[in-house]
Swiss-Prot record:
One of its GO terms (cellular component) is ribosome. This is Large ribosomal subunit protein bL9. GO terms for biological process: translation. Binds to the 23S rRNA. HAMAP family: Ribosomal_bL9 (MF_00503).
Amino acid sequence: MKVILLERVEGTGVLGDEVTVKDGFARNYLLPRGKALRATKANLATFEAQRAEIEARNVKNRESAAKNGEALDGTQYILIRQAGESGQLYGSVAGRDVADAIKAEGGKVDRSMVVLDKPIKTLGVHEVKVKLHAEVTITVTLNIARSQDEAERQARGENVINSQFEEDRAAEAEAAQDMAEGGAGSFEGDHYEA
């Protein structure tokens, strides 16, 4: 299907381009979202008559997104989630969770703007791209932790999962040493009378 793009569409073209796309892409994505018009003679004439207005609106939207992006770019958000000992989350962090975290801090982001290749399923610090406009993309940092204290440790660059394993190993070694010396928890010297 031939369409006229009303804004830049990644991998397809820029404002004003007359391109041929698959019917499903046009019917399910471009046309319902107002990103394109069918390339008919009437629509071509209408587009050319309104081209300056459409371009001005696009520039205004881009500038607004760039201004919003300057405030959000590089910001860090903490998400507290439950996770197992290995750092695997019970569930995952999706685009909606990222958008909600940004909105909670006063940002103007919709979940469709969040670009995640796949949901985040582990604890740690993750970089996430947010596409505010077809030409404005920013990066925010998500600090996913089990507690506020753990989030602060991760923010300092500490690998919380590895340090937890080291603490567990040290505790086990201390318990084994204590048992070997006949300290608390050993059975040496315990007398049971029947």
